[in-house]
């Protein structure tokens, strides 16, 4: 299902400086400045149709140490549409980011190699605004823009993190012993999701053996 005016464009860059790579992305889902240009007497900042996101990060290595730091931000209602079938998703899954929209995210990854041992620590902190019952503050891309909680299709005054303020924390620590044809690994993961409505914490442990190249997975 398609309709005119529903487009998404993006740009990216990367700059290599010695052993470091600086990178970023900019995405525009919708940008409505005509109301301001026409001196609309009802115009205010935070118009919900100004939908965009961006990413800034750098990664590199120093001797046996590798590192990555990244910041991501997506404004409320981005990737959504007034017609739900036209949102940016596939098989009821968000294509761009698991959090949908309306979030700020900081990621840090540090790795260290010594002999046949690899160590990796990954941390993620996300600040988002979720919906309470019967509301739509722009995080859920599977709701219609016309149902925006602050004015529907004429929604002004929106800001990143509006709604039920929620902090998501994720920590992963991995140790890998590299043998001739397989890796023996152990992982411990901590997940915490906290807001005024909930406080959920989960801990996961994993031990296993994997061989390459079929199970070599990198998420960053």
Set out the residue ranges of the language-model regions.
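Exposed, low-structure sequence patches enriched in small/polar residues
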Residues: 1-220
């Amino acid at each position: 299902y398609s309709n005119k005016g529903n487009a998404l464009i993006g740009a990216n860059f990367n700059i290599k400086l010695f052993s470091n790579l600086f990178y970023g992305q900019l995405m525009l889902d919708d940008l409505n400045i005509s109301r301001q240009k026409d001196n609309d007497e009802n115009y205010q900042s935070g118009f919900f149709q100004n939908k965009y996101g961006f990413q800034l990060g750098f990664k590199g290595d120093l001797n046996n140490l590798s590192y990555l730091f990244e910041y991501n931000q997506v404004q409320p209602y981005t990737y959504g549409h007034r017609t739900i079938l036209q949102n940016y998703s596939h098989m009821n899954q968000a294509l761009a980011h698991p959090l949908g929209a309306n979030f700020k995210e900081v990621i840090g990854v540090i790795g260290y190699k010594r002999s046949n041992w690899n160590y990796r620590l990954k941390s993620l902190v996300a600040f988002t605004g979720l919906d309470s019952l019967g509301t739509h503050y722009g995080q859920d891309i599977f709701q219609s823009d016309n149902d925006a909680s602050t004015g529907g299709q004429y929604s002004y005054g929106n800001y990143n993190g509006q709604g039920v303020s929620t902090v998501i924390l994720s920590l992963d620590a991995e140790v890998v012993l590299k043998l001739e044809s397989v890796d023996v690994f152990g992982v411990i993961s901590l997940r915490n999701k906290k807001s005024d409505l909930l406080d959920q914490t989960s801990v996961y442990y994993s031990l296993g053996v994997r061989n390459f190249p079929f199970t070599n997975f990198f998420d960053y």
